[in-house]
């Protein structure tokens, strides 16, 4: 019985490369001369450092641009609040989201059941397994999910016949 998994996962290697490119651009840009602006990464947590709110916005824009160039969807980023650290300096923690959340998984299952396509959906951890008897049904399910779920980037992998 053909099946595939619906997941939501950023390519962390590309995220790391985008951070390195962002730091390189920040270190060479004229408007950041003499400032302590940078992006640091610990696992799935990115920390943006800057001298003030304006420069923090600039750092964020550089990072988003580099992520977009490396085909990493910016909807994976979950921004924390801006915190003041010593003096005028500020930092912001950005989390890279992973996995299909419980609410989104339920929404996907509901969409699949309401679509009247002859497939079954089951929640398996942080993924949703879609299985059906015909490959065409699975492909139409993928098209329907791409159209209807716009708030979170979805990937479709583990396609089996």
Swiss-Prot record:
Keywords: Nucleotide-binding
Highest taxon, organism lineage: Bacteria
Leader peptide range in chain numbering: none
GO molecular function: nucleotide binding
Any Pfam family matching the protein: DUF520
Gene Ontology CC terms: cytosol
InterPro entries in the record: DUF520, UPF0234_N, YajQ-like_sf
Family to which the UniProt record says this protein belongs: Belongs to the YajQ family.
Function noted in UniProt: Nucleotide-binding protein.
UniProt name for this protein: Nucleotide-binding protein Bcen2424_2555
Source organism per UniProt: Burkholderia cenocepacia (strain HI2424)
């Amino acid at each position: 019985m053909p099946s595939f998994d619906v997941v939501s996962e950023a390519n962390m290697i590309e995220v790391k490369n985008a951070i390195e490119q962002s730091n390189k651009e920040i270190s060479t840009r004229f408007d950041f001369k003499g400032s302590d602006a940078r992006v640091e990464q610990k696992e799935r947590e990115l920390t943006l450092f800057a001298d003030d709110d304006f420069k923090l916005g600039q750092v964020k824009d550089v990072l988003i641009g580099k992520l977009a160039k490396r085909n990493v969807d910016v909807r994976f980023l979950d921004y924390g609040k801006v915190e003041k650290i010593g003096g005028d300096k500020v930092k912001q923690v950005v989390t890279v989201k992973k996995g299909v959340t419980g609410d989104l998984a339920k929404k996907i299952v509901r969409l699949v059941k309401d679509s009247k396509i002859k497939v079954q959906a089951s929640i398996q951890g942080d993924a949703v397994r879609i299985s059906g008897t015909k490959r065409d049904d699975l492909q139409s399910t993928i098209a329907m999910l791409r159209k209807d779920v716009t708030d979170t980037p979805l990937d479709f992998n583990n396609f089996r016949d």
